[in-house]
Amino acid sequence: MSIIQSIIEKAKSNKKKIVLPEGAEPRTLKAADIVLKEGIADLVLLGNADEIRNAAEGLDISKAEIIDPLKSEKFDKYATDFYELRKNKGITLEKAKETIKDNIYFGCMMVKEGYADGLVSGAIHATADLLRPAFQIVKTAPGAKIVSSFFIMEVPNCEFGENGVFLFADCAVNPSPNAEELASIAVQSANTAKTLLGMEPRVAMLSFSTKGSASHELVDKVRTATEIAKNLIPDVAIDGELQLDAALVKEVAELKAPGSPVAGRANVLIFPDLQAGNIGYKLVQRLAKANAIGPITQGMGAPVNDLSRGCSYKDIVDVIATTAVQAQ
């Protein structure tokens, strides 16, 4: 069973309600058809009901709940509650009402109020359009110092990682994390590997240097982050700084990082910044024909997940299933 199939089966075992703000978007509707037919999750589609049904011609979304924020009985309450959340930031009630007309803001309020268990959006919106309301409304989880993102990477015919399965982070949220933030990303990712994927994490803190082979402040950041992360979760195998080949290839690891508990065996790859992470996952996705599931957020008060605007309907199914499992 593939990793995504195991996630789908787990989602089915304890169904959650996921809200989709892009209710009339064609790929989203095709994904909704599949999710509902397979019993992966219960769905709420946001938008004009006629537009959604017209766009869904030939698909079966009869089991989905369709809510138009502009006509919803929840609108006034959500606007008032949003005003209470943001009044210290200078927002007025009128501005709150205008803001809640946005489907993503409305959907985040549904999650905040407990009407839905999670939210998936981003097929036609930029990441910032999702993260802004998520941070304002859903906020970070108790004790979380940072919100980050990860991709589950399934690489076909791959001898590395966990039989070709990896967790890559952070590939979508934090442009230039400092050492403490990078350590938090590593800790979150290790926990996600355990709880979501059932993997024993072996975390590689990636760099262009392996164990002092180069000297630079960027290397120092990764090295410091590694020590912080080790202190935070001493029972987890974390090592760095490691170049990618040393992290994955046993023969290279024996030369560059002998004795490392991670080198040559890594299944969780922590990139030093967003440029490296975003480029890295797309290289593997396109050149190795990997299945890239994500970006999935970690550290939020409830699961609110982004999509790539280049996503397929199958990608949306995968993210909905993953979001549902996060909500369990």
Swiss-Prot record:
One of its GO terms (molecular function) is phosphate acetyltransferase activity. It is found in: Cytoplasm. Pathway: Metabolic intermediate biosynthesis; acetyl-CoA biosynthesis; acetyl-CoA from acetate: step 2/2. InterPro entries: P_Ac_Bu_trans (IPR012147), P_AcTrfase (IPR004614), P_AcTrfase_dom1 (IPR042113), P_AcTrfase_dom2 (IPR042112), Phos_Acetyltrans/Butyryltrans (IPR050500), PTA_PTB (IPR002505). It is an enzyme of class 2 (transferase). Signal peptide: none annotated. Its main location: cytoplasm. One of its GO terms (biological process) is acetyl-CoA biosynthetic process. GO terms for cellular component: cytoplasm. Keywords: Acyltransferase, Cytoplasm, Transferase. Pfam families: PTA_PTB. It comes from the Bacteria. Its EC number is 2.3.1.8. It catalyses: acetyl-CoA + phosphate = acetyl phosphate + CoA. PANTHER family: PHOSPHATE ACETYLTRANSFERASE. Belongs to the phosphate acetyltransferase and butyryltransferase family. This is Phosphate acetyltransferase.
